[in-house]
């Protein structure tokens, strides 16, 4: 008989490691599982020292979070451990974050953290502790399929859904992971924390990248990749120099404000050329992208991707975490994979993720995704970049 976590055995005979960040979500997760009778072990990861990250002395800014997690563990009566993962977090997340910005991309460090630190390293630690599952406070869910495997699905609360950040989760990891908050809303989670008497019930959510609490990610990049701060030219789509910039790291695709150049019509950042140290700008219509080339694909749908893709696979994709899934086609091309959007998306930036879903609404299943390598813009009047996805061009006649 399966317990509430879809695991064999009674809760009291089932050890579950909970990744405790010190926030209300993971704290409520730990308290809920403890109340259900599971053998819960809380683990908090010390991932970085903020002072070191920006090259100045100072205490770890995550100290309060560790204190809060420890206080919650004491309150609900579970063992709690703090593990030093700083070196692996720097290698897997911070260094790649700086490399990505220096190459003209806009990275999503939370995806890499989930993929390489939490769901690889911490999951391995949980197994070593004899756990049957690793539970987190993510707003996402999973369900058992007929063959015994598990599917990753969107949270019931779409405003809180974090599936975009978990697309790189593997099938093997999904078998071991559990997400108890997947069917709850944030207000329900806070109320649950109050019922358990947790001190973090009203703790504010973090709004910044965890290792950049000041919001100035350029401080981290400048420390690790000073070449990214070298000045260069701001040019239009025809290559005409319109002005200079202090470093491509200060810009992202779709940006309009802060360009430092005068123009009779609004200009937007279209792309960043790290090799030439150029910021390419143009009209808003040039931001519309139809075709996206992907790298590092992770497929967690049914079967193997090569077997199911055929001449093209119809699905829905999100190119930013804050955007709704849009209809698209996934195709094999040039030894890799491309996405053709039915309707163009603005500001598709290399380094961001393109996540696949089987539906646009409800608790859709996550089919996987990949990182955006490049994108081709929709045809627009003016400029040289009049490129159109071949399939869409044929459809339009």
UniProtKB/Swiss-Prot annotation:
Residues annotated as the enzyme's active site: 113, 210
Residues where ATP binds: 19-26, 45, 137
Segment forming the signal sequence: none
Disulfide bonds: 113-210
Region named Interaction with tRNA: 160-162
SUPFAM superfamilies named among the record's database cross-references: Adenine nucleotide alpha hydrolases-like (SSF52402)
Site (Interaction with tRNA): 138, 352
EC nos: 2.8.1.13
Similarity field: Belongs to the MnmA/TRMU family.
UniProt-recorded name of the protein: tRNA-specific 2-thiouridylase MnmA
Organism, as annotated: Rhodopseudomonas palustris (strain ATCC BAA-98 / CGA009)
Gene this chain is encoded by: mnmA
